[in-house]
């Protein structure tokens, strides 16, 4: 058995996974940027490893996280959306003496979708996780592209607006600054004067107010910015398909049909003959946990 851990920008998921990469048991909880969040995360990970280990032979612990994974030192640095400069997992390894494999969260989720989900029938594809930020994974000829330091292909940080809005990475005008679902939801809540609300309830409120001039403008701007970002991705990689994951999936009724229609209508790419298939992630929150142990 293996333990797959997905540390996202707003949640942590921990699963017990069998030899066929099927989840047997899982637990999920919300987290947020705050003081000492590193210690809280390590405590949660420690608790569930100990729990699963009591009745299972654990051969691997896979951890998918935003930031820069360093498997040599067992550290993850620059988890910017949680304000974590360095998350040190070496003590976990020394305590349990179980191999630990660190991966980028979006690349882990993309790998799971590529092998078992929405992208399994394609050889050339791009996975975009639109949530707290925009994470990405790129597949060419059936292989996940990896940069020299396992950090590259950060498509969320392609600049789509010169001197645009400030991004957490330090640059301005990044793709994720305009198209991360967190930003969209924040703007929608401000327009509708709503504070505490779930994503599902917020989507219903937006649907009810779809004729609201500001909401309609917000949706149009979001789709327009998404197409600009996608045009860069398509021109660079020429994928057969692009899969959207993250909370974008829960808002598909607002965006999906209109996005596909506008993509085919505008053909805002160098090669105007072929438009990649736009698909939605199938594994949802399970993808990161599964991909962490592949």
Language model feature labels by segment:
Residues 25-28, 79, 147:
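Residue-level detector of high-confidence beta-strand sites
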Residues 105, 131, 292:
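Active-site glycine-centered loops adjacent to acidic/histidine catalytic or metal-binding residues
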Residues 74-85:
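A charged helix-plus-loop insertion that forms the helical arch/lid used to bind
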Residues 10-11, 108, 132-135:
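Conserved A3 ("GATE") glycine/threonine-rich loop of ANL adenylate-forming enzymes
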Residues 103-117:
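Conserved PLP phosphate-binding loop immediately N-terminal to the Schiff-base lysine helix
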Residues 120-178:
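Glycine-rich phosphate-binding loop of actin/hexokinase-like ATP-binding domains
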Residues 1-60, 70-73, 90-100, 115-122, ...:
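ATP-binding/phosphotransfer module of carbohydrate and carboxylate kinases, centering on a glycine-rich
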């Amino acid at each position: 058995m293996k333990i797959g851990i997905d540390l996202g920008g707003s949640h942590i998921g921990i699963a017990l996974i069998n030899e066929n990469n099927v989840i047997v048991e899982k637990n999920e909880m919300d987290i947020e940027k705050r003081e000492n969040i590193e210690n809280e995360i390590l405590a949660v990970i420690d608790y569930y490893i100990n729990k699963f280990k009591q009745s299972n032979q654990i051969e691997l612990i896979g951890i998918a996280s935003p930031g820069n994974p360093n498997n040599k030192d067992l550290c993850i640095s620059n988890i910017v959306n949680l304000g974590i400069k360095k998350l040190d997992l070496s003590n976990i390894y020394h305590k349990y003496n179980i191999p630990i494999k660190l991966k980028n969260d979006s690349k882990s989720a993309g790998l799971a979708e590529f092998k078992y989900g929405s992208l399994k029938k394609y050889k050339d594809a791009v996975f975009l996780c639109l949530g707290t930020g925009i994470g990405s994974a790129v597949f060419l000829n059936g292989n996940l592209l990896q940069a020299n330091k396992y950090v590259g292909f950060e498509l969320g940080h392609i600049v789509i607006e010169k001197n645009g809005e400030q991004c957490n990475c330090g640059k301005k005008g990044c793709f994720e600054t305009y198209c991360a679902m967190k930003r969209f939801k924040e703007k929608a809540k401000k327009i509708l004067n709503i504070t505490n609300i779930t994503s599902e309830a917020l989507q219903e409120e937006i649907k009810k107010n779809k004729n609201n001039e500001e909401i309609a403008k917000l949706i149009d701007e979001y789709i327009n910015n998404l197409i600009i970002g996608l045009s860069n991705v398509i021109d660079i990689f020429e994928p057969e398909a692009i899969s959207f994951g993250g909370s974008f999936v829960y808002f598909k009724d607002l965006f999906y049909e209109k996005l596909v229609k506008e993509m085919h209508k505008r053909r805002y790419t160098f090669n105007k003959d072929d438009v990649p298939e736009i698909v939605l992630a199938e594994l949802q929150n399970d993808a990161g946990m599964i991909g962490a142990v592949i």
